[in-house]
Every structure is written in structure tokens, then in C-alpha cells.
Amino acid sequence: MAEQGKRRWWRLADGIREGRIELMYRRHAAEMSNADIAAEVVATALIHAVVGRVMALLVSEGRAWDPGLENLWIHTDNDGGIDWAGLADTTIRVVDGDVLAGEPGVVALPCEPALYVWLAHRCEPALSLIQHAMAHCAGLSERRFWTLVGESIVGAATYVPALARTNSIEGARRGQAMIAALEERGLPVRRTCFVR
């Protein structure tokens, strides 16, 4: 981010205080016939910026950058939609044994479960901030928000391996491991079944 002009870039951590998430929602709600759908569109875009994009790298290569609240920057287009995400710190996390381990800008974690625990820990504050903002400005329910998070992860685990021509079984396993890591933090990212 140090090399980027700051026009239309904003740090996710500052987005609530500056009213940017509410502004995104109001713009979408004004253009759509249903405010609930507008809320889901905005929430999905923000969720994708935090967890969806990093999941693409995780499911295809078993690596991750830091999607932490203070590290993630958002770029909006002329219509107020998200078109890019950026990082203040581009350090990549890998698992010991990865060919990148020991390279500059790379931190090796001791095992794959440690990578999921770290990533869930880094995603939670940003996702929680977005969830609270969307509940406040759009009335999006907590349950629906966390379901959208789970759908983003499952979507990445499903589609990225096909598009990147990587192992789909490995991608699905990594996606489920990430969902489990978020669940272990108490986040309800799996859909619940209704029994009648």
C-alpha cells in the first residue's frame, strides 16, 4: 500500500468510523428494488475482500496473507463498489516444508492446523466489524451474515481449484479446515438444518 495513491483506497479499520460501509449500503439500496438484497450484496463484497480472496490462495497453494483489520485496504470504484483489496504488509504465511519457507517476506508456521488457527484469528476482527456495521446500517441478521461467510469459503474451495487447475480434493479439505477453525472461535459459519 505504500506505493499506492490513496484516492478511493480506505483502510478497513477506518471504514466504520468514516461511514464508508453505510455509504456503500445506501448506494446499493438506492439502486436496487430490495434493501435486503442490497445488504447481502454489500456484505458479500466485504466478506470476499476479507476472507474470499485469501481463501483462493489458501485452497490452491496452502498459503495465506494477513487479512487482519489493520492490514487490509479496500479500493472502491466510481459507483462505490469494491474492485480491489490491498495489504499494508504483504508477508505470506506458509507451512514448514513449503518451497517458499525461509524466503524474504515469508513466515513459516509449524503445521497446517496452525495456519488455519492463525488465519481464523486474523479474519475474525474484520469480519465481526463488518457484521456489526451491516446489522446497524442495514439490519442484516447475524445468522445470515455468518452464513454468507461460510458460503464464501465453500465457494472458493469449490471454484478456485477448477479455475486454477489444482487439486479439488485438497481445496475442499482446506476449505472445510478453515470453516472448522472459524467455528472453533465460536463463529456460526455453517448453515443449520431445520428438522420438521
Q: What are these model-derived regions, one by one?
A:
Residues 1-49, 56-59, 63, 77-196:
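Nucleotide/phosphate-binding site architecture used for ATP/NTP-dependent chemistry
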Residues 72-74:
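Hydrophobic residue at the +6 position relative to the catalytic HRD Asp in the kinase catalytic loop
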Residues 63, 68-70:
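Canonical protein kinase catalytic loop motif
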